[in-house]
Amino acid sequence: MLLGASLVGALLFSKLVLKLPWTQVGFSLLLLYLGSGGWRFIRVFIKTVRRDIFGGMVLLKVKTKVRRYLQERKTVPLLFASMVQRHPDKTALIFEGTDTHWTFRQLDEYSSSVANFLQARGLASGNVVALFMENRNEFVGLWLGMAKLGVEAALINTNLRRDALRHCLDTSKARALIFGSEMASAICEIHASLEPTLSLFCSGSWEPSTVPVSTEHLDPLLEDAPKHLPSHPDKGFTDKLFYIYTSGTTGLPKAAIVVHSRYYRMASLVYYGFRMRPDDIVYDCLPLYHSAGNIVGIGQCLLHGMTVVIRKKFSASRFWDDCIKYNCTIVQYIGELCRYLLNQPPREAESRHKVRMALGNGLRQSIWTDFSSRFHIPQVAEFYGATECNCSLGNFDSRVGACGFNSRILSFVYPIRLVRVNEDTMELIRGPDGVCIPCQPGQPGQLVGRIIQQDPLRRFDGYLNQGANNKKIANDVFKKGDQAYLTGDVLVMDELGYLYFRDRTGDTFRWKGENVSTTEVEGTLSRLLHMADVAVYGVEVPGTEGRAGMAAVASPISNCDLESFAQTLKKELPLYARPIFLRFLPELHKTGTFKFQKTELRKEGFDPSVVKDPLFYLDARKGCYVALDQEAYTRIQAGEEKL
């Protein structure tokens, strides 16, 4: 900004005051520019101009369409109707579990029967119906049918039980609950504590003895319902579509609000940014109660006319066979799925598929190249985003390890920023003017996005709980008087504007005066331990500053040569990042999106009287890992053992 002002000032002075000819003015400005470090600007411009222009065009296209749909009061069901009209007999959804194919017309008719049935039962626009069901075609038809009536679906995580499940139902204020027959036992566990006015419907196989007494079998009721479209509700593009619950890794799940424009924006930025085509076939094995599976995946069917193959759950052994069977051209991934695939023994199917793109987020940089080269996937379409965030990113040119970019030349076009935070408390650091301090290239910081409620691409729809909203909004971030969304994620930007994920706030811990990135350490340890699941976290040790690193490894101790492992770590990780404690256990508990649940692991710590799994600690004198028994634990607690 200062350089630009200086150049403009020099231009005016040279031309208006000195009255120099344009050739001399231009030469003078060039000298001033290069003398001010402008050659870096030129280098960045040359290397990023094509990327930035393409990204800007994608942003402009989506923004233009969103504004048009706002004026026309479009909704997701209305946009889907245009797809049905365009190709009614094209396959829309395929459920791998039963090899069931639904055309766009069939999906349209099923969802209309849902809308008519709910309307006949007294539900109306603005009411909420909870949906608790594993992946299948009906899942999509049910929430889409609710949306046709203006009813808002609360999409419940199928891994939730008891208190967490009850919490989600209570906070949604649902008037009805539709659950899959496979979830009947979970509903029976909490049935006594549910509101007596809550209507219960079961979809799938019907066995009256396995469901609460008041439950009705939904499937025959839908067959009898009219299949014509009910009257369109008075809803627009910024009205609520459904609710998606956060994973709940740090507490009870929160209901994030998804409005129609957000659904469109998330699906379409991916569609245009990664150059998808209507004839692509998407393999979606991600849970449909989360945005990656339901918006990024299913959204390509509803909004752009693609065929989507739905799988109940991810299977590493069946992944490529499914892709071949259904001629998939795009596969979705999240979190650790790519590592699970790499961990499979080589097979013929992994080179006979037609997949041209892997679409998702969370692919570790350490296995990125191995994944794309082994499975012959030309394009890794990595993106960054959360259901509720207003600062999504896309790695449109497959930069290895990057989750997206922001223009260094025209950064104001997409108002996101990395801001400095306190390394211990993760609180925002502000300058003398009270405004957050932006990070320089190479400097880690929290990603924030400026909130502009009038702009559908910049608005923050938040959560049902206002208290949760307050924790995600900061004031005076870009300038005085503004507001910004706090992602809670630490990223770092390189000189060209590419952004790399570092850590989620709370996942970084400090040891020996240094910050330890759990994400980086987990990636290294997993690679060294034959792609085993590894969760890294900090534990408190009496008499020491910070937290000592501990790694929980989902692998038998017999699979690890501890002496060799310790020696290899010396080459792979700096001293402060090497885990002090190791815990070997049968499996690590994960969320539905494959995030490790570390809360209980932290609580249990390294106390052998609490943890019954094999424990080891890094003996500083011997330079290797030794068994951590009660005697060693006592010495560590007393400060007699040097760590």
From Swiss-Prot:
GO biological process: establishment of localization in cell; fatty acid metabolic process; glucose import in response to insulin stimulus; lipid transport across blood-brain barrier; long-chain fatty acid import into cell; long-chain fatty acid metabolic process; long-chain fatty acid transport; medium-chain fatty acid transport
Pfam families in the cross-refs: AMP-binding (PF00501), AMP-binding_C (PF13193)
Family: Belongs to the ATP-dependent AMP-binding enzyme family.
Function, in words: Mediates the import of long-chain fatty acids (LCFA) into the cell by facilitating their transport across cell membranes. Appears to be the principal fatty acid transporter in small intestinal enterocytes. Also functions as an acyl-CoA ligase catalyzing the ATP-dependent formation of fatty acyl-CoA using LCFA and very-long-chain fatty acids (VLCFA) as substrates, which prevents fatty acid efflux from cells and might drive more fatty acid uptake. Plays a role in the formation of the epidermal barrier. Required for fat absorption in early embryogenesis.
Cytoplasm in keyword set: no
First-level EC class: ligase
Gene: Slc27a4
Name assigned to this protein: Long-chain fatty acid transport protein 4
